[in-house]
Amino acid sequence: MKLEQLMEGVPFTLVQGSLDTEIADIIYDSRKAAPGLLFVCIVGTQRDSHAFAADCAAKGVSALVIQHDIDLSAMPGVTVVKVENSRYAMALMSANLFGNPARQMTMIGVTGTKGKTTTTHMIKSVLEAAGRKVGMIGTNGIYYMGRHKDTANTTPESYELQKTFREFLDAGCDTALMEVSSQGLMMDRVAGVHYDIGVFTNLSPDHIGPGEHKTFEEYRSWKGQLFKRCDVGVVNIDDENTAALLEGHTCKLVTYGRDEKADYRETGYELLRTHDFLGVAFHVTGKDEMDVKVNMPGEFSVYNALAALAVGKVLGLPDAAIHDGLGKCVVKGRVELVPISKKFTILLDYAHNEVSTESLLTTLRAYKPHRLVVVFGCGGNRSKLRRYGMGEICAKMADFSILTEDNNRFEKVEDIIADIREGMNKGNPDAKFVEIPDRLDALHYAVDHAQEGDLIAVIGKGHETYRDREGVKTPFLERELLEEYAQQIGLE
């Protein structure tokens, strides 16, 4: 592609060279420099890649995009373009390179502090129940047409994002659904992408600190940018930050929640539990009337489901598809049931800190199990405060705990468990627990000692597929391991 085509829609100044320069691909990692490529110099939080421009020129790149002036004396044969913001420019250039695929699909973006992953999965399930072909991007990776790829960030860098959109389109997807993080918005990863629907789940202080957001107000402001880049905003009317977040919005609004003014309002829910189902049922009023059953527990599941329902309504999907999609939705590693016995209920969840653990156990306690049992550990080479906190919460809220490993990395599991034990003793000196350092043995123990009506939560790893010991990662898929053991012992 000619550089002139690549720069379409990007304000720039040609410093030297020609816009007729042929560009084979865009890079922003100087280690990938090679002839025919364009290197984008980015001013990052840790370093400024303008420092690598000369090295890239020496390796034969055809063009450079710069944000501030650099010494060009040693690179006379390289075309150089100057822009005001190289991250923003790279986003638009990447879209041009891949043929602006986002313009050819229905685009849905979901933002919020909590619930993004679950809500996107619910929306995907509803869309697919209606026959839509969906590509999804988020915390759990990239999914489309039966394929899965991991991603480093909730919202990938703009080049990878546009490349993924192209893959979605080429594979036959008609809809792209993604989690949109505040970092993704602030760092221009989604610049140039216009959404048909933007979804807001909720907001609480998070991602505030060095390299992230300076204040909660800044964090909220960046979240709100999504609603200046979409046609319809589907928003949680009950959240106290909704009004401030929507300041300056340019989209039409559709609301959900419990407030009487909500377009889609939940008017009471009940908890449902069997050995292979843990969820909620509720009635929706407002712009429409519908009874909904969701295969995920807790109050937040109601809100996430309302958001997905509202998206379905905005898109004009059949009620049957919305109902079926919500009823069948399962999120890997997020309160994921493993139905191996009719006697007890066992589930996997990614809860790996004090806040998420307390939230999960509060949700599960509401189902009034015979015993609430927790299998957990804490990661090595991480804050000890997390160990004390999780230990304290489990001691207070669980009837029985099984302390074990969780990615020890380069620490001894015995030392990690000792820290957890300290938190347990603080939370409840009479707490009942057992220490089983090997996680597989801990899973077997949980199954072997399960009682009728128990609810067993295996937490910390969730969707992870490995165990990290001494920096060596080996396969560890908890769902498969539990299913294999149940079959091995003839569990019913």
Model region roles, listed by residue range:
Residues 1-14, 35-38, 51, 250, ...:
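ATP-dependent carboxylate-amine ligase
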Residues 1-92, 269-270, 293, 297-299, ...:
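N-terminal leader/targeting and accessory segments in enzymes
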Residues 9, 70-76, 171, 196-346, ...:
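Acidic, Mg2+-coordinating active-site environments of NTP-dependent enzymes
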Residues 10, 89-237, 241-249, 306, ...:
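Phosphate-binding loop of NTP-binding sites
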Residues 44-46, 182-183, 204-207, 239-240, ...:
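Short glycine-rich anion-binding loops that position phosphate/pyrophosphate groups of nucleotides
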Residues 53-58, 169, 191, 365:
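Non-catalytic positions within long, well-ordered alpha-helices that form the structural scaffold/packing
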Residues 62-68, 233-237, 375-376, 399-406:
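Short internal beta-strands
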Residues 136, 178, 198, 235, ...:
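Structural beta-sheet core signal
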